[in-house]
């Protein structure tokens, strides 16, 4: 589990293999539409990845891509050609992900930005509309090249209110007494009831009253948190803990300093005693020898 770096600050267990950051579904649609995203545990087991479409073998940077609800990414043209080749009477459960055999069509009650972006792709083709329960397109419309929707469409994940101005009376014109044409527009308010603005969205736009000091190691927490630390960095982090503001009671820090001082003093006394005994070993060895040999003088 990790915290996404977007303003929503959502807790997620999904991890971007390319950028090595935790990502939520909103970021998958907006900022990481073509990245390889799987669980963080999967990245710990095997961090190697191939940023190619498994259907055609080419890189995902070429062409529009679609992300399924299982978070696997494919070229939309490749996936559309593969699923369109199936029989017309194929059940929705027969359309499965080529990588993990999970059903392509999301559940009707699933509230997810990834599912909304996927539905915008599926609604452009007949096999997708059939699985979603929508009316099929005519043969002429189906033969024409469908307009490819944007993967990072704001309408799929936006929480803002959309106001559409339409003309009343079925686009019928009304004429004023002075002869000028006038149209009486009215507004229809469509609100997104699934994703209301959270309190974090309002709090992110507020400026703090006082500057907040970054925690120890906070400058490189997101960039270098997976790199191996050097002994110098570990020692500097340990020494800075004495000066960094802490929420712990002050007596704990005093107790730690006193204990560390006592241990250092005991170690110093033991070291000096050991060095003192080492210098007198040669003298004591002569007095304690049970078989002394007198020196012979010529």
From Swiss-Prot:
Gene3D superfamilies: Zinc/RING finger domain, C3HC4 (zinc finger). The chain crosses the membrane at residues 255-275. A zinc finger (B box-type) spans 1-43. Keywords: Membrane, Metal-binding, Phosphoprotein, Transmembrane, Transmembrane helix, Zinc, Zinc-finger. InterPro entries: ZFPL1 (IPR039043), Znf_RING (IPR001841), Znf_RING/FYVE/PHD (IPR013083). Its main location: membrane. GO terms for cellular component: Golgi apparatus; membrane. A zinc finger (RING-type) spans 53-101. One of its GO terms (molecular function) is zinc ion binding. It comes from the Eukaryota. It is a single-pass membrane protein. The modification Phosphoserine is found at residue 214. Belongs to the ZFPL1 family. This is Zinc finger protein-like 1 homolog. It comes from Drosophila erecta (Fruit fly).
